[in-house]
Amino acid sequence: EMATVNGLPLLSETERNPMLTTTYGTGELILHAIEQGYREFVIGIGGSATNDAGVGMLQALGARFLDKDGAVLGKGGEILHRIAAINFSSVHPALKDTRFTIACDVRNPFCGPEGAAYVFARQKGADDAMIEKLDAGMQSFARLIHSTTGREITHVPGAGAAGGLGGAFLAFLNAELKPGIDLLLQTLKFSEKIKGADLIITGEGRTDRQSLMGKVPSGILEEAKRQGIPVIVVAGSIEDTEILNQAGFQGLFSIIPSPMSLETAMKPEVAKKNICRTVAQIISLVNL
C-alpha cells in the first residue's frame, strides 16, 4: 500500500508540496520485497501526497533521469519538465520476472484537464502555478515515455492515479491496472452479501464528483443498481450533490453537526460519534 510511505496523511498541511514529494519510498518497499524473493505484487496506489509520475519509485529501483546536458536529476514533481532521457542500465534485474497488479480507485488520465495535476494536486498542496507546471511536466514526460517505450499513456484511464504513479507502472513495469473497488468487492463477495438488502449506507471522508471516478461509493452504487437497492452516502464533507444524485445516490449526508476544524473532525472518537448519530437519524427516517 503506497500510502503507508507516500500518503497524504503522513504530512501536515504546511509540509504538503507536490513539487518536492516523491514516490521513492514505494520503490524502496518494492526493492526490499524483490530482494526477499517476491515476484508477484498487488499494490494499492490511492491517497498519495505525490505528483512525480512515479519517477521516485523508478529511481529507487535503479533508474536514472537525465536532463538535456546528461546530468542526473533529483526527485519530486519539479523535475518532470526537465527530464530529457532515462537510463535503465542499473535497474534490478529481477524486475523483468516480476508481475504487478495495481489496485487503482480512480480512472483519471495521466495529464490534461482531468489528469493527475489538475484534479488532485491542489489537495496535495499545489497552487495554480504549481498545477500548471506539474501538468506541463507530465505532458513532457508522457511524450518522452512514448518516444522511449512506444507506449502512449496520456489518456489511459488510471494512469493519473497517485500523481501519475499508475502511468509509471503501466509504461515501465508492464503492470495491470484494476479498479481497487473491483478487487475489494470481488474478495468480499459483495454481490452475494447484499442480496435482499433494503438499503446500503456507504461513505468516505469527502464525497464529490471525484467519487464517481472509480472510488468505493461508485463501485457500491454500481452493484446496488443491478439489484435495485438504494444507496445513501455519509461523509465528512459533501460537494456536487446534484451530480451525485443524478448518478443514482438516494441521499447524501454530512456527519459534521457544527463548525469544527478538520483536525478535530478526524479524531477517531469524534468521527465515530458523528457517524453513529448521522446513521441513527437516517434509520429513523427510513422507519417512518
Task: Label each residue range with its predicted role.
Residues 1-45, 49-288:
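N-terminal loops that bind phosphate or other acidic moieties
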